[in-house]
Amino acid sequence: MTANTAAVSELERATMRRVAWRILPFLIVCYLIAIIDRGNIGMASLQMNDDLGLSARVFGFASSLFFFAYFLVEVPSNLAMQKFGARIWIARIMVTWGLVSAGTAFVVGPYSLYVMCFLLGAAEAGFFPGVLLYLTYWLPSAYRARMVAIFMVAIPAANFIGSPLSGLLLGLDGWLGMRGWHWLFILEGIPAVLLGIACLFVLTDRPEHAKWPVSYTH
């Protein structure tokens, strides 16, 4: 290996570290919130059942509607991401799913729950594959598997954080006259909205649009 080749290789590694620290922590937090929001209905189900008389069959059908909408909208969502750009579209996904998740606090029966679960699936569709597509814009193929593996740390982190957090929020039962499950949906939905707005300032569609140095050959 020549000195010039070694210098280029070191520059590439340094750039990859800069890219990783710039975008991965933010995307990991976004995905962590997505997983927590996706599972909060299970945590809320006992209190919701007491208040609304919802059976296990109702919750099962509501969950199936979430995944039906998710798969139905996933491909169109990713096509839209290519048209509008990753920054705007990931922001749109997060803001809409945060609003829908928070809005689930106001369901009054099985049919309104069905509607909200369907809307949540449609709103969240495209986020995970969209992030993977976004990473391909920034990372040469040699680095993608490692970076995706780091990104996936959000899954065990969400499982570790989500249950205790949801338990604490359910403990707000009676605060300001609202049930714990109301607070669970509202307070776990708000971070997605805030992170969605932050996407507009934190993310950049492609390396050539970055305002910070990205000097490697993709």
Give the residues covered by each predicted segment.
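Extracytoplasmic
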Residues: 22-56
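Residue-level signature of mid-helix packing/kink "hotspots" within the transmembrane helices
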Residues: 39, 67-75, 159-160
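Conserved MFS/SLC helix-loop-helix module at the cytosolic interface between two early adjacent transmembrane helices
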Residues: 73-108
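Paired small-residue
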Residues: 100, 111-119
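Cytoplasmic helix-loop-helix junction between adjacent transmembrane helices
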Residues: 119-153
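Glycine-rich segments within core transmembrane alpha-helices of 12-TM secondary carriers
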Residues: 148-167
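Symmetry-related core transmembrane helices of the 12-TM Major Facilitator Superfamily/SLC fold
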Residues: 183-201
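Conserved small/polar residues in nucleotide/adenosyl-binding loops
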Residues: 217-218
